[in-house]
Amino acid sequence: MRKMKQCVRTEARPWRAWLWLACEIFVLYSMVRSLRMGTLSDALVCLLVGIGVALPYLLEACLDWRMSNTLFVFCLFYILASMSGRIYKLYYRIEHWDKMLHLCGGVVFALLGSYIPVLLNEKYRSDRLLRILFAIAFSIAISALWEFYEFGMDRWFGLDMQRDTLVSAIHSYELGSATGVIGSIDSIESVVVNGVPLDGYIDIGLIDTMGDMMIETFGAVVYAVVFALDKGRHPAFTRVGAVCREAGKTVLA
């Protein structure tokens, strides 16, 4: 923590420190707002996001790597957009807000994944194929873990993070006339559950989950293509030797 504070104080690009401070103030405002509205769960989310906003500086302090300006801004946007989706109901007020975040998440986690092999062993820096494959796999793995989390929250706490979709047709072995035969119900116009009429059959989040994972995978593939074409000309991270120890002087390792 002391090293992170020193990194902020010796920031060679002061606008980054001011942007980070503005983000933390926005998170603090959102937390106070949630407490005043009595939504303690939202206030807890804000607290966690406040820690998340500090992650770019934490990574730089712990790894002695300097994050590019573009990635720094993109990470802050992604973290705050995720919080705003819940706190300010943007998931419901702006169409495809959730999908946009999953697309951004696919890019962010693939980017981080492409640098993990280098962090483990510097000799992998030039092995671009390995880094591309690891980036895509890492992003897909994070996407799957997130969907596990959403499933658990829906299953055990009665939430609806895996948003339901009304479908107009069902194809299932459970409907078949014999073992191994798929039965179908087509052109579903209405369903009644315990006396409650619905406009169609609820899929209990399956379509939303698969859509999220495909979008996140697409984001990872997009990053992989850009990474391959860039050929290291615009690195997202730059290894530094003593950036946090020499009052803002950046020394390339």
Predicted regions and their residues:
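Membrane-interface helix caps and helix-loop-helix hairpins in membrane proteins
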Residues: L35-L40, C62, I87-W97
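Short, highly charged, low-complexity non-transmembrane loops/tails of multi-pass membrane proteins
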Residues: H234-A253
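Cytoplasmic-side transmembrane-helix entry/capping segments in multi-pass membrane proteins
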Residues: L47, R66-F77, D98-L103
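Alpha-helical transmembrane segments of multi-pass membrane proteins
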Residues: V53-Y57, Y78-S82, S139-E150
